[in-house]
């Protein structure tokens, strides 16, 4: 059986609230760090979320 191309990553809030999302990305197609603007319910606004490894 072939190894999957997708890996699970954690998107951590840049507002330092401790809030994070867990999502998947294609490791071969996207080699850089993922960054997207999403809603942080602790800060109650949209902020940048950056990729971090799941420990």
From Swiss-Prot:
Gene3D superfamilies: Ribosomal protein L33 (2.20.28.120)
UniProt superkingdom: Bacteria
High-level lineage: Bacteria, Pseudomonadati, Pseudomonadota, Alphaproteobacteria, Acetobacterales
Protein name: Large ribosomal subunit protein bL33
Pfam families, sorted: Ribosomal_L33
Gene Ontology CC: cytosolic large ribosomal subunit
Family: Belongs to the bacterial ribosomal protein bL33 family.
GO annotation, biological process: translation
GO molecular function: structural constituent of ribosome
InterPro entries linked: Ribosomal_bL33 (IPR001705), Ribosomal_bL33_CS (IPR018264), Ribosomal_bL33_sf (IPR038584), Ribosomal_zn-bd (IPR011332)
Keywords: Ribonucleoprotein, Ribosomal protein
